[in-house]
């Protein structure tokens, strides 16, 4: 294959094409979207984690010039909008009615002529709260005498879920020479994207049409839900996700602010915009982690792992409002067996409602993978110290070997490939591990506190195969639509949505790799449901494995038609034609060729008899399998015993994308 033809493709470093507009301040975010007669919305939030709402008095707010409407839960309830579905199959209060269930919950909204008036009016709304005891500990929430977080539920259990074989695991533990136990809490954290949530809605009730700008990682899924809530045909609802200033899982859920903005536009018959403030974002939008984990590792006398047992308490706050595949209530936590050949395992998970903001989003990972890797790596390291083994050696003894692939884990995953020992050995070599250990011992004799940590992890990404993965019944495929115009340039439309990942560069590069077209000649569209094929969006480490694969597949679909056009131009049979990126040529005479640009022109000006003109196709890609990235990290950290100050002495990371 000609080197020049490959240069636009995968493996070559290209400047990110989208960065220029951001550096110049020319990005288009929801806050940049406006329209004539646009009104502005602000949200009143509860200062209490749990309270009964005795009354809401908005009389004083209406005395402020410019206030258009005050929306409460009771007003929405009269329009059948008190509750909205979540992407995990639960329901969530749009605005609190009768009771607030977490600090920061949306209680009322003011819509005014300008944002300053809207925020000032919030201070004039009088809410009479009766404070109630709040449940913030999931263990307490499961006690028989605990008050209900949700009146629509019979208890505070969100779900019960398990994976693996409990009986076989019990037998493995009964035969173990040693059992290592760990209880740990992975605390709640907030993704805190640079841009908070935002929504612009322009609803025309007479035309039955809605145009909505949204900070969404999954525009098509949000369109499906919002169309149902509004009672509009889905094709009449347009969701546009323009430039998004980061998300990290935080912009996958559907939020009450979005729904109320749309409802306000419907009520007022004019455009309404809501820009969330940082306080509201940190108080109420999707948190991550919040797992209480109990892990047990059974080992024989030589340090071979015999079994793994895990119990989880997952705190989801007042509403199960994140986005988990419906079959996997605890996400993909059952990747917890990691890189190790563990014969049997059993994981049981309990999701719990508490008086906290909704939690459980996949922050910087794929569906709970970070928590899983944290637990198994802590367990293996603890076991090594208990057995007086080097942590690297215990890992080597228990890795899945290359010849064992494809490998089925004890919790049901089918790993396709990996060489975990090679990754660890490379990380140890690059870190100078043996020398680090010597320096550690010498330092201890001089009173230095130096720790050396190792992590050898396996992730799971690319959700997912439709037979197993969906959100609210929507299968987790993704899509790409590609058209080659007569000049040989390309227009690519995607079902995934960028929030800063660089899709406009990455996906253009995939087209360049497949077709030999310069990435500069590929226009990439995404984030507009009227101008892109239906897809599940970008979250959970899936955009390139699914959307990227859809892009590669649609390129190859086009090549099938392009080959017939090339054969017609060269006046030979299809079988006489060969392809390399950028050109078709005769197998018997490689200098006789037609370029992809010449083929594109012919598709519109001189197609073969009986062939439909044009050169375009769409691919809905259903992944046959997940992907299993893996790696090994080595870090050395020193702590000052007098001040507690710490510093990283060395950090080496070895990653394989799977």
Residue ranges of model-derived segments:
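Glycine-rich loop/linker segments at domain edges
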Residues: 12, 18-21, 86, 155-199, ...
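Short, surface-exposed loop/turn segments at secondary-structure boundaries that line and modulate
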Residues: 71-105, 139-151, 217, 221, ...
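Flexible hinge/switch segments at interdomain interfaces of large molecular machines
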Residues: 30-38, 192-197, 347-358, 482-486, ...
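Internal maturation/activation junctions in enzymes
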Residues: 574, 583, 587-628
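Helix-loop-helix junctions that connect adjacent transmembrane helices in secondary transporters/permeases
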Residues: 143-230, 401-489
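Structured beta-strand/loop patches that form or line metal/cofactor-binding pockets in enzymes
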Residues: 272-295, 466-469, 618-641
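Alpha-helical support elements that line or immediately flank enzyme active sites
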Residues: 43-73, 109-129, 199-268, 325-337, ...
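Flexible, low-hydrophobicity surface segments
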Residues: 1-155, 182, 257, 464
């Amino acid at each position: 294959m000609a080197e020049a033809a490959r240069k636009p493709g995968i493996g070559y470093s290209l400047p990110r094409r989208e960065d220029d507009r951001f550096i110049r301040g020319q990005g288009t975010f929801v806050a940049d979207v406006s329209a004539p007669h646009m009104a502005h919305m602000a949200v009143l939030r509860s200062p209490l984690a749990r309270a009964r709402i005795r009354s809401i008095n908005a009389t004083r707010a209406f005395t402020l010039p410019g206030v258009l409407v005050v929306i409460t839960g009771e007003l929405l309830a009269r329009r059948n909008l008190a509750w909205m579905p979540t992407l995990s199959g639960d329901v969530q209060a749009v605005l609190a009615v009768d009771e607030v269930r977490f600090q920061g919950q949306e209680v009322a909204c003011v819509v005014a002529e300008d944002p300053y008036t809207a925020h000032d009016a919030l201070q004039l709304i009088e809410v009479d709260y009766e404070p109630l005891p709040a449940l913030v500990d999931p263990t307490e929430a499961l006690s028989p005498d605990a008050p209900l977080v949700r009146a629509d539920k019979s208890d505070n259990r969100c779900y019960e879920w398990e994976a693996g074989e409990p009986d076989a695991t019990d037998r493995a533990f009964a035969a173990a020479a040693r059992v290592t136990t760990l209880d740990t809490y992975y605390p709640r954290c907030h993704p805190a994207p640079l841009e908070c949530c935002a929504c612009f809605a322009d609803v025309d009730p007479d035309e039955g049409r809605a145009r909505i700008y949204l900070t969404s990682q999954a525009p098509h899924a949000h369109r499906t839900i919002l169309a149902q809530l509004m009672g509009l045909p889905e094709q009449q609802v347009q969701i546009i996700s323009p430039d998004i200033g980061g998300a990290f899982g935080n912009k996958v859920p559907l939020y009450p602010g979005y729904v109320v903005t749309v409802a306000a536009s419907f009520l007022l018959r004019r455009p309404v915009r809501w820009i969330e403030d940082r306080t509201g974002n940190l108080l109420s939008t999707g948190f991550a982690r919040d797992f209480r984990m109990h892990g047990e590792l059974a080992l024989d006398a030589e340090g071979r792992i015999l079994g793994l047992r895990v119990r989880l308490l997952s705190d989801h706050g007042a509403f199960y409002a994140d986005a988990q595949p419906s079959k996997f209530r605890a996400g993909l936590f059952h990747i917890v067996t990691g890189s190790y050949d563990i014969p049997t395992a059993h994981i049981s998970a309990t999701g719990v409602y508490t008086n906290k903001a909704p939690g459980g989003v996949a922050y910087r990972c794929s569906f709970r993978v970070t928590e899983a890797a944290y637990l198994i790596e802590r367990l293996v390291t603890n076991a090594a110290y208990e057995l007086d083994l080097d942590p690297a050696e215990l890992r080597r003894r228990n890795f899945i070997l290359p010849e064992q692939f494809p490998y089925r884990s004890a919790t049901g995953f089918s790993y396709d490939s990996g060489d975990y020992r090679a990754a660890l050995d490379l990380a140890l070599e690059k870190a100078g591990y043996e020398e680090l250990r010597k320096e550690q011992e010498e330092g201890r004799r001089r009173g230095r506190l130096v720790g050396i940590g190792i992590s050898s992890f396996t992730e799971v990404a690319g959700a997912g195969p439709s037979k197993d993965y969906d959100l609210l019944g929507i299968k987790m495929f993704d899509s790409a639509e590609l058209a080659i115009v007569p000049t040989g340039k390309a227009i690519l439309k995607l079902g995934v949505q960028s929030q800063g990942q660089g899709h406009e560069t990455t996906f253009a590069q995939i087209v360049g790799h497949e077709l030999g077209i310069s990435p500069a000649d590929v226009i990439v569209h995404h984030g507009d449901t009227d101008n892109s094929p239906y897809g599940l969006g970008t979250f959970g480490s899936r955009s390139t494995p699914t959307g990227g694969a859809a892009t590669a597949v649609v390129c190859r679909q086009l090549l099938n038609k392009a080959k017939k056009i090339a054969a017609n131009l060269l006046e030979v049979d299809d079988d006489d034609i060969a392809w390399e990126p950028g050109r078709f040529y005769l197998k018997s005479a490689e200098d006789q060729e037609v370029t992809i640009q010449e083929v594109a022109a012919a598709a519109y000006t001189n197609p073969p008899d009986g062939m439909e003109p044009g050169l375009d196709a769409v691919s809905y890609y259903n992944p046959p399998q997940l992907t299993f990235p893996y790696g090994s990290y080595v870090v050395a950290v020193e702590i000052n015993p007098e001040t507690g100050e710490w510093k990283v002495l060395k950090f080496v990371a070895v990653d394989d994308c799977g």
